[in-house]
Design a protein with these regions (language model features):
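N-terminal extracellular ligand-recognition/capping segment immediately after the signal peptide
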Residues: 36, 43, 51-74, 78-81, ...
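Predominantly extracellular beta-rich ligand-binding scaffolds that present long acidic/polar faces
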Residues: 64-74, 136-139, 147, 160, ...
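Extracellular/surface-exposed low-complexity segments
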Residues: 22, 26, 207-210, 215-276, ...
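Right-handed parallel beta-helix/beta-solenoid
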Residues: 23-44, 48, 59-61, 251-295, ...
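Surface beta-loop-beta hairpin patches that serve as ligand-binding interfaces in beta-rich domains
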Residues: 247-263, 305, 638-688
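Right-handed parallel beta-helix
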Residues: 110-184, 364-494
Length: 789
């Protein structure tokens, strides 16, 4: 019995040693598509592998989407065992545009991928598809650990981070080529998030180039935890990367670059694009245009001294008609300008992509004379972390917005944003609190002569279907029309159907809301048509607005210091003005020379907690609108609102024109005294800029300038058909003469003169819109110019 026991113990010991030895010695699992290996698919080999094993794929194209499944293994081609780089191109993982080609998402800590071509992947995750080529996704503090060696990662797509996505991972990149991947939004090549640490091999260097996305085309970081990042590669797209190529969307990371080669020399020249152009063209002239807007943006230089412009020829730009890549981005100090918004159209084909998306580092740019239409996305034009951006003469229409954003949005911490002659109409917001436009965290904002019409927004709690601005600087809304915008809140009480101006991080500057028209806006399960807030040390100037037939419990809700002058307020609801109780601020309302339905009783002062100064000149009468034509809310003859506004407009900072660009202060009742009217229209006044313009004869007078926009100088060209006196003046947007460039008698012909951006006293003028006015005895005509600074 004792001998049998000893033998039994011996066999048990041997069995244990054999098992332990099998665990300690890595197995090599072969993958051959001809069936002569252990398996025919890489995933089958991974499923059979244990920690430390090698899954070795022989040449072939593997149409699969592999997952390391939490195993610390090496998955490699024969390049791993032979050192022969030819096996990289011969051993392909093709994701078939179904998901990420390779996923490491299950707590792998020491995995290796080596020697493959990774292509045709389409990201993983739910809505925001990430990592078309390789998706590395950890759960901090449990980080994914892996090495990616000698792989070619190309031809992959995703919403973000198309080539490689690293989220909470420690990743070593060695000898990889990451090129020609495309992300709809950012990170065409590599995207890095969270607490990740990505290290580039300084000996066996990677190359990252010619990837595409709307912004951060090669490398994007989206992390507040990565304060420094070193890019060490053999080849990059450009020699001196700017934020269009590399940036951190969430933090001002200190980037350093060690680049040995580059493939693109940015073109320091205006570029021309046409729907029937060709991207092999230089793009240097209208006669040799490029085709894709995205390609022109990628190619053009960002020049802080001499801003450049991408000129779009008339036509429709879309994926279906001329293979446009949407969305496209833009660089700092680059303008995108069409011929005019009627004939230069960017069409989204009702796809799920936006149209124009930018991020940190996008500044000093103008988008003008374009129409954006027919897109279905989380947002149409998205400009995050942007500063000194102008939108002039653009239309956004016939779009569907999903998932919380807007048709035009500066989503995070924007700087100074300006709208002029912007139309946003027929936008349907599905599960989004604001349909048309949302400016979030702007330093300064202005909207002038804009139209927000027929926009609808529905969500659990809506903000505004028209314009929503939460800013920490001064805000101006001037000469705008808000017509038939509708909000529907399905849960909590919503805010304002048409206009919402509020603070950002407990600060806001002065608000100037004047000469606007609000008609037919509807707030379902919400509060008001207009909401505006000031801080105790700032104020709201609410002057010369017309609010008619808007449906909401309150026409306007105010908080702070409000100066309410010269308005017409006659709406469908309980009160025209609401001042709610706030334990942290007492509101003060100064109200004079308004026509308010219900008079002083139409002001709701909750708990009597706020202070209302009901001053002189307020009335409650039928305004007597003309109710016909394109502007039916002009005052009719005999209206008691004519010449009934504030006698002295000093300190109101009103422009000299009304909604129709007629004189703002005019003697409408013919008593010999010019006085401002109530509302946004001045009765029977003459045009402001050209009040004494002669009748235009049928002769050929022409005026233009180039470049336009310009900095610091431009050449103004003009043609006169007959001999006579000629004057060429420059006016600013306020109608003030800046300079006289020509004052002489001229023979018929074409002439040009240079303007250096200085006024009559040789002082540099500020950036903005200017008009070159050509004056002859026969005709006065003008041309708009844009000075970019």
């Amino acid at each position: 019995m004792k001998q049998n026991s000893t033998i039994k113990k011996f066999f048990i010991t041997v069995f244990v040693l054999i098992c332990v030895n099998s665990w300690l010695i890595a197995s090599t699992i072969t993958i051959k598509q001809d069936g002569t290996g252990d398996f025919t698919t890489i995933q089958a080999g991974i499923n059979a592998a244990s920690h430390g094993d090698i899954v070795l794929a022989y040449p072939g194209t593997y149409y699969e989407n592999i997952d390391f499944s939490g195993k610390n293994i090496t998955v490699a081609s024969l390049e791993y065992t032979t050192g022969d780089p030819q096996y990289i191109a011969q051993t392909v993982i093709d994701g078939q545009r179904q998901a990420s080609c390779v996923s490491l998402i299950s707590a792998e800590t020491d995995a290796v991928l080596e020697g493959f071509t990774i292509t045709n992947g389409q990201g993983g995750g739910q809505y925001w598809l990430l990592g078309g080529g390789i998706n590395i996704f950890g759960d901090y503090p449990e980080m994914i650990g892996c090495s990616i060696i000698n792989c070619v990662i190309t031809g992959n797509v995703a919403y973000n981070s198309a080539g490689i996505c690293v989220d909470e991972g420690n990743v070593f990149l060695s000898g990889c080529s990451i090129t020609n991947n495309y992300a709809y939004y950012n990170g065409g090549g590599i995207g890095i998030k969270g607490h990740s640490n990505v290290v580039f091999d300084t000996i066996n260097r990677c190359s990252v180039y010619n990837n595409r996305s709307s912004y951060s085309v090669d490398i994007v970081l989206a992390s507040p935890f990565i304060h420094e990042f070193e890019v060490v590669v053999d080849t990059f797209t450009v020699a001196q990367p700017n934020p269009y190529f590399v940036t951190n969307n969430a933090y001002n990371t200190d980037f350093s670059f060690d680049l040995q080669n580059y493939v693109l020399e940015p073109v320091d020249h205006d570029l021309y694009v046409s729907p029937d152009g060709d991207d092999i063209n230089s793009g240097f002239s209208p006669d040799e245009p490029m085709k894709r807007i995205n390609t022109a943006v990628h190619k053009i230089a960002s020049n802080t001294e001499t801003p450049r412009t991408i000129h779009l020829a008339p036509g429709i730009y879309s994926k279906s008609m001329n293979d446009q890549i949407l969305p496209f981005g833009c660089k700092a100090y680059v303008n995108i300008i069409g011929e005019n918004q009627e004939n230069t159209i960017i069409d989204g084909d009702i796809s799920e992509d936006g149209i124009l998306i930018t991020s940190r580092g996008y500044e000093h740019s103008t988008i003008s004379d374009l129409t954006f239409q027919n897109f279905q996305s989380i947002g149409g034009i998205i400009t995050n972390y942007s500063d000194m951006i102008r939108y002039d003469n653009i239309t956004i229409k016939n779009c569907i917005i999903t998932d919380m954003l807007s048709a035009l949005i500066s989503a995070t911490s924007g700087g100074n944003i300006a709208f002029e002659n912007v139309t946003i109409e027929n936008i349907e917001g599905l599960d989004t609190p604001n349909a048309a436009a949302w400016m979030n965290g702007t330093t300064g904002f202005s909207a002038k002569n804009c139209l927000f019409r027929n926009n609808t927004s529905s969500s659990s709690m809506t903000t505004s279907a028209g314009l929503y601005v939460n800013g920490n600087g001064d805000m101006t809304v001037e000469g705008c029309r808000f017509i038939n915008n509708t909000t529907t809140s399905t849960n909590a009480i919503g805010w304002a159907s048409a206009l919402l101006l509020t603070d950002y991080n407990q600060f806001i500057g002065d608000s100037y809301i004047h000469d606007n028209l609000f008609v037919g806006n509807v707030n379902n399960n919400g509060k008001s048509t207009v909401y505006a807030k000031s801080m105790p040390y700032t104020k709201i100037n609410f002057f010369n607005n017309t609010l008619i037939d808007n449906v909401s419990p309150y026409g306007c809700e105010f908080e702070g210091n409000i100066y309410c002058r010269n308005n017409i307020m006659r709406n469908i609801g309980d009160y025209e003005i609401a001042l709610f109780y706030d334990p942290e601020i007492t509101s003060y309302l100064w109200c004079s020379h308004n026509n308010i339905l219900g008079g002083e009783d139409a002001i709701f002062n909750q708990f009597g907690a706020n202070v209302v100064y009901w001053e002189e000149g307020n009335i409650d009468v039928d305004p007597q609108f003309v109710l016909v034509g394109d502007d039916p809310y002009q005052l009719a003859a005999g209206s008691l609102c004519i010449d009934a506004g504030t006698p002295d407009t000093t300190g109101m900072f009103l422009p000299p024109w009304d909604m129709l660009e007629n004189h703002r202060v005019w003697d409408g009742d013919g008593n010999g005294e010019a006085r401002i009217d109530m509302g946004c229209y001045e009765f029977d006044s003459e045009p402001w800029a050209y009040a004494h313009q002669p009748v235009v004869p049928a002769v050929d007078y022409q005026i233009s300038n180039y470049p336009n926009p310009f900095n610091p100088s431009t050449t103004i060209c003009f043609t006169v058909p007959q001999q006579g006196a000629v004057k060429l003046h420059v006016y600013n947007i306020r109608g003030q003469k800046v300079a006289t460039l020509v004052d002489c008698v001229s023979a018929p012909g074409s002439y040009n003169v240079q303007w250096d951006g200085r006024d009559a006293d040789n002082r540099p003028v500020g950036g903005g819109v200017y008009f070159a006015q050509l004056v002859t005895p026969q005709r006065t005509t003008a041309h708009k110019m844009i000075l970019i600074k």
